[in-house]
């Protein structure tokens, strides 16, 4: 697929592991590849990301992408948070009905902005709802996923990953 779309000459692209997600209407579809199915794809995508000639910020982007594909591969293989997840701290989601989720994979409401006058702060700062319980669950590694959006936030807040990316960029 990647090579078939090369004629479009995109400056950049990203792929993401298909997952069952409430907001995408894919629950029960069994679309997530097995670790064995995804591993060679992740290796291929990482190698392509590292081989792309790039300068400036694009070098960092490609280095983070190469790291993301390997992280996603490990999450699928190990079925655990390979690096700590920051969902509910670094990111959150508001569903169309006003439910606040720490993460769209779990899609578990921790509050509803309709009940707080559309003010996120009481929910986010744990004055109402159960954001504290969700954060505790996530920190306790009770979940794991390879979702790109969450993974990039997690990688940016994970010192060893940032150091690896920096080393790849400087060492290239």
Task: Give the positions of each predicted feature.
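Flexible mid-to-C-terminal extensions adjoining Fe-S/redox cofactors in radical SAM and related proteins
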Residues: 80-82, 99-172
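Radical SAM enzyme [4Fe-4S]-AdoMet core and its adjacent flexible, acidic
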Residues: 1-101, 105-115, 157-158
